[in-house]
């Protein structure tokens, strides 16, 4: 059995998965911007137009939160840098994503206030907020376990598998939240144009394939 050859093949597959993830991730950002800026009213948190405020939510929850979380996961496993640099970039990208996610969630609540809608009544909102809170807990857990100098190497070794599995599970929960959010928004729009409907479908597929590619990259990245 050629272990060296197997490792080389897995490293190549990991690099390919990372490139594919970047492609679908950036494609989803572009499609999101086309949708919100061309077909919808635009993006503005402080606008008097409630629909512009609402558009901040999907923009920041994907482009600012989910996309950065995926990048953070791949950075830790696939970036060619020292382990300490990988950890700092991993934690930093997660933190930026969480901050932008808070703004995105506030935009949804702000929209509800403007149009007198109740908060937290949809499956999307339940999945989304649960995922966001758990990811915040995951970040705090990781900071105290893997970045704090007083944490022992034994503790880090024991906790690492759970941290990795939790991160991968939360990535998929975030993908589910994004897709249910797109479905909910499409339902709100009613009879939109065929071109817009197709764009939303392609956006959902790009987000899904981004998440799958990130997971493949992370799963194979341990062989780098």
Curated annotation (Swiss-Prot):
> Could you name the Gene Ontology cellular component terms for this entry?
membrane
For this protein, what is the EC number?
7.2.1.3
The function of this protein is: Two-heme-containing cytochrome. May catalyze ascorbate-dependent trans-membrane ferric-chelate reduction.
Give the source's domain of life in one word.
Eukaryota
The protein's topology relative to the membrane is: Multi-pass membrane protein
The name this protein carries in UniProt is Probable transmembrane ascorbate ferrireductase 3
Where does this protein hold heme b 2?
90, 163
Q: Where are the transmembrane segments?
A: 19-39, 53-73, 89-109, 127-147, 162-182, 199-219
Positions binding heme b 1 in this chain are: 57, 124
Report domain Cytochrome b561 positions. Answer: 20-219
Assembly: Homodimer.
Required co-factor? heme b
The reaction(s) annotated as catalysed by this protein in its Swiss-Prot or TrEMBL entry are: Fe(3+)(out) + L-ascorbate(in) = monodehydro-L-ascorbate radical(in) + Fe(2+)(out) + H(+)
On whether Electron transport is a keyword of this UniProt record, the answer is yes
Stored PANTHER family: CYTOCHROME B561-RELATED (PTHR10106), TRANSMEMBRANE ASCORBATE FERRIREDUCTASE 3-RELATED (PTHR10106:SF15)
Gene name, per UniProt, is CYB561C
């Amino acid at each position: 059995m050629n272990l060296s050859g197997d490792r080389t093949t897995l490293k190549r597959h990991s690099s390919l998965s990372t490139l594919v993830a970047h492609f679908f991730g950036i494609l989803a950002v572009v499609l999101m911007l086309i949708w919100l800026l061309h077909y919808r009213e635009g993006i503005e948190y402080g606008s008097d137009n409630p629909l512009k405020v609402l558009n901040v939510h999907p923009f920041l929850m994907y482009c600012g939160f989910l996309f950065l979380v995926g990048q953070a996961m791949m950075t830790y496993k696939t970036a060619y840098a020292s382990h300490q640099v990988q950890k700092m970039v991993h934690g930093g990208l997660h933190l930026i994503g969480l901050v932008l996610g808070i703004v995105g969630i506030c935009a949804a609540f702000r929209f509800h206030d403007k149009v007198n809608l109740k908060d937290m009544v949809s499956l999307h909102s339940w999945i989304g907020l649960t995922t966001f809170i758990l990811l915040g807990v995951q970040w705090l857990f990781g900071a105290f376990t893997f970045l704090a100098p007083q944490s022992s190497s034994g503790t880090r070794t024991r906790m690492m598998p759970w941290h990795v599995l939790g991160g991968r599970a939360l990535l998929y929960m975030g993908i589910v939240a994004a897709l249910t959010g797109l479905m909910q928004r499409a339902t709100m729009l009613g009879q939109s144009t065929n071109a817009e409907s197709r764009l939303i479908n392609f956006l959902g597929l790009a987000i899904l394939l981004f998440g799958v590619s990130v997971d493949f990259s992370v799963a194979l990245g341990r062989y780098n």
